[in-house]
Amino acid sequence: MTDGADMPCKAKYLLVVSMDVDPDHEALFNEVYDREHIPNLRRVPGVLGIVRCKREELVMSIGGETRTMRAENEPAYSAIYELESPAVLTSPEWTQAVEAGRWPTQVRPHTRNRRHVLLRAMSEPSGSLTS
């Protein structure tokens, strides 16, 4: 798993991919994601950075009180891909990378509750708004 050293984000687009994995395949999931899937996708032109995350309990102050926030059915694992453009996601290099290695045959079939969300940044790293 990456340590967040790629932050802060300087990309105009973020792809957030989230999923759960069958417990019996969790070790393989993490091994393949870290050693194969991310390295393959980092080589794709237009991929500026990748960080993996695992959901944790969220306790925060909001509305004058401390609350435990619960997001029903939120997947346990997420990967955030920093992209130059949404066109990266349909490039031949991306198409090849997402089907490389053990991911499509040994890991993907054991994932569920998958979500893919594309976000466009509304501010520059300095905090100024973009158009």
Task: Give the ranges of each region predicted by the language model.
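Macromolecular interaction modules
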Residues: 1-131
